[in-house]
Amino acid sequence: MKYSIFILCILSLHFSYSQGNNVTLLSQWSDSSLPPVYDGESVYNEVWGITKDGIEYAIIGSRMGTHIFRVNSSNQLVEIDFVMGKHTGSDAIHRDYHDYQNYLYAVCDEGPSSLQIMDLSFLPDSVSVIYDDDSLITRSHNIFIDTAYSKLYSCSNKNSGGSNALKVLDISTPTNPTFLYNYDLVNHVHDAYVMNDTAFLNCGGQGLKVVTELNQSCIQIGELSTYPQKGYNHAGWLNGDKNIYAMCDENHGLDVKVLDVSDLNDIQVKSLFNSQMGDAPNSIAHNVIIRNNIAFVSYYHDGLQIFDLSDPLSPQKIGHYDTYIGNPAVSYAGCWGVYPFRNGDKILVSDRANGLFLLGFQPPPVTVESPHEIFPNPSNGILYFFKDHGLYADYTLHIYNGLGQQLMQIEGKADYTQLNLENYKSGLYYLRYVSNVDDTMFISKFYIQ
């Protein structure tokens, strides 16, 4: 009876949609003096990150070139250098980056442009361009470096002599790249993920191709040409166990695909997921990187979206941060690229209009399998609420002390929510979950030590 009265006496409040969930803004940079590209708004493009001598660095491209930042001890972005691109016209929309050993490689898909190689050995003070040449690469859409085999894969190449789908360079001498071979058995390669001489190629309308090298040429060892919600196969990333691959189709309203690639002769789609935001029918997943089975996805309209892929059959949304609060119907506006540092607690995100973001994130410390759970329990005041993916990701959490007094209320838009109760004393507390979509409600108890 007391339990029933306790429930009935609780009052419900409603708060507006939050820009972020489980993700915090640490630092943000933009430069109002930079000119936009031809659409009048977009200035920035790809983002990349490196760690050198224990210091984290951020790289972002703009219409004008490459901006390099240090992440200081206060988690603030400090710009330390800028490298002008060979091409800086109003059409300079696409730049891409990858690092190898002590060098940063940069390309542009408008031009005439070039391959630029920057020496990073003088960081944190400056960088220097030691190679800027268009003989091997004039225009390239994306690059990826297979560090184990010292090869640079250049996608969708264009030069005065024509174009080719994929070009592979030898960078075993990092400052003196040399040509190895072209791969043109597909019409187009938009992006690539390469590990140990095996390349997962995103081939637009031709789907996913997997190739490896044989006698200085590529042979196909796997493909997925037909799959649910197929569109323009744009980008993907392999997990650390090399058995799960997340794949984005760059089309309005198409879900991200989770693939089982343990058998390249029989690639299987295990699940699909999307941002679960209000404008999901218009949303476009652009790029993805996986760290420790957590997928960090950049969505044009919806910003950074974070999903736990520990169970590839049921991806769990565990965080988001919207970098673009403008009209969600604007096509291809907003978040462009994402780069989580190795442990996933700091994330770099680029927004086409709003520049570079450094975001903080606390990955789930454990995996739980019950429909809903609070962990750790008991805790020191920092704890996590986790719900089953089958429950709607639109809910309100009410926190009460042992006397039934409400202490806080949190709007949830993800399967996983961090709770900070460090300022509350030790004892018994209650969490009440209320769905904002249906009549689902439950109460759990937890303890603060």
Describe the residue ranges of each PLM region.
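Bacterial Sec-dependent N-terminal signal peptides
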Residues: 1-21, 377, 405, 441-443
